[in-house]
């Protein structure tokens, strides 16, 4: 499976962006990136990580045609970018001052944007967590064919607060094993989020009491809270949907790929640009890397033991996902087979219990409605 492999300079840039945060722990950051403190200090001491451009910063005699060519060059390189982003990047990178409205007019005049694009680009009004790693979104960007007759299933995980892309992985399928391995690598480098939100599809959705999959049980045992989007409500995952539109417009629709290795190479290049160069309108045109910091919750070497508070009735889940409580059989989830679950009495409701896997409430049941033994 083609795991993403950053160049030395990309790794250095990603490290430096995170190392310059006021609250960063340099030793922990070095461990997660697999570099020594000596290397970290050497990188931090350098004035730049690449040769600086020799392009003149100002050109007062620039013609209108030249200005339009610069706008179109940025748009052609990033087809999903609009007037505000292009104007911001031209000023930031080339010291070219141009109004966003002028950029939009140029794009319309050169047929780079359709009259309907403004309506399609209207953003959802959505909740934003107050800090990084409070919420990660996770989903697959559909799948597309490769010239070797295989298919690519892009796994995407952005941080909801900063829009920083944590995972962009080209997978051959949507099975648990590939997703869990990609998450494990991300947890080692970036730490654990407080919560992950997904839709209700495989491999993270299931039906029935508890509705858990093996992947979800693993995430819960790591101390991560889980939530699911409401069916047929894409605005719940609006930032993930927007990320997918950009990925499709700027990468998937612009290339024909031979195999997963080639896809991953292009994904890595685009991911770096998305995190470190692309301004995002919602957080004041800052790049995601400017707003992101790694989680202080490190990935544990082993899964912690499962514990429940006093007052819970603990039962071990038997084959088929069943537990027994007061001579009554309760169905949980087959993914919990062999694991202890907590049955927590519901206040002011005799015979009713909340069903818990570690910290996560996975359902409720009433003894009067269950199957008596």
Identify the function of each model-found stretch.
Residues 174, 183, 187-208, 230-232, ...:
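Acidic/histidine-rich, metal-coordinating catalytic segments
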Residues 26-33, 86, 90:
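Short alpha-helical "recognition helix" segments of helix-turn-helix
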Residues 271, 275-373:
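C-terminal, beta-rich DNA-binding module of retroviral/retroelements integrases
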Residues 65, 96, 101, 105-164, ...:
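Mobile-element integrase/transposase regions
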Residues 208, 215-300:
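Charged alpha-helix within mobile-element recombinases
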Residues 6-24, 68-77:
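Short, amphipathic alpha-helical "recognition" segments used to contact nucleic acids or chromatin
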Residues 45-138, 143, 202, 213, ...:
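Basic, flexible linker segments flanking DNA-binding modules
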Residues 15, 29, 40-43, 70-71, ...:
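Mobile genetic element proteins and their domesticated derivatives, centered on retroelements
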């Amino acid at each position: 499976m083609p795991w993403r492999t950053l160049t030395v300079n990309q790794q250095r840039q990603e490290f430096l962006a995170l190392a310059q945060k006021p609250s960063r722990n340099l030793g922990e950051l070095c461990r997660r990136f697999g570099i020594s403190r000596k290397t970290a200090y050497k990188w931090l001491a350098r004035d730049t990580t690449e040769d600086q451009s020799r392009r003149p910063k100002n050109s007062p005699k620039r013609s209108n045609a030249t200005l339009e060519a610069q706008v179109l060059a940025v748009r052609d390189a990033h087809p999903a970018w609009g007037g505000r982003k292009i104007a911001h990047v031209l000023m930031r990178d080339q010291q070219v001052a141009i109004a966003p409205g002028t950029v939009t007019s140029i794009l319309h005049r050169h047929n780079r944007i359709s009259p309907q694009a403004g309506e399609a680009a209207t953003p959802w009004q959505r909740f934003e967590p107050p800090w990084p790693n409070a919420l990660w979104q996770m989903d697959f960007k559909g799948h597309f064919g490769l010239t070797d007759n295989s298919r690519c299933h892009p796994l995407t995980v952005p941080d909801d607060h900063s829009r920083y892309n944590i995972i962009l992985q080209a997978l051959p399928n949507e099975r648990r094993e590939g997703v869990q391995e990609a998450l494990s690598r991300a947890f080692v480098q970036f730490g654990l989020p407080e919560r992950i939100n997904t839709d209700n599809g495989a491999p993270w959705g299931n039906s029935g009491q508890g509705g858990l999959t093996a992947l979800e049980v693993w995430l819960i045992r790591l101390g991560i809270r889980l939530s699911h989007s409401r069916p047929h409500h894409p605005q719940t995952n609006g930032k993930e949907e927007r990320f997918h539109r950009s990925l499709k417009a700027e990468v998937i629709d612009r290339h024909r790929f031979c195999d997963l290795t080639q896809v991953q190479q292009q994904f890595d290049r685009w991911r770096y640009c998305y995190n470190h160069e692309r301004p995002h309108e919602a957080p004041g045109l800052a790049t995601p890397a400017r707003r992101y910091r790694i989680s202080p919750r490190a990935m544990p070497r082993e899964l912690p033991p499962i514990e429940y508070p006093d007052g819970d009735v603990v039962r071990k889940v038997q084959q088929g996902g069943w537990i027994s409580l007061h001579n009554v059989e309760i169905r949980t989830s087959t993914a919990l087979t062999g694991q202890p679950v907590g049955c927590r009495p519901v206040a002011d409701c005799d015979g009713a219990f909340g069903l818990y896997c570690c910290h996560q409430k996975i359902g409720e049941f009433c003894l009067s409605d269950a199957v008596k033994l």
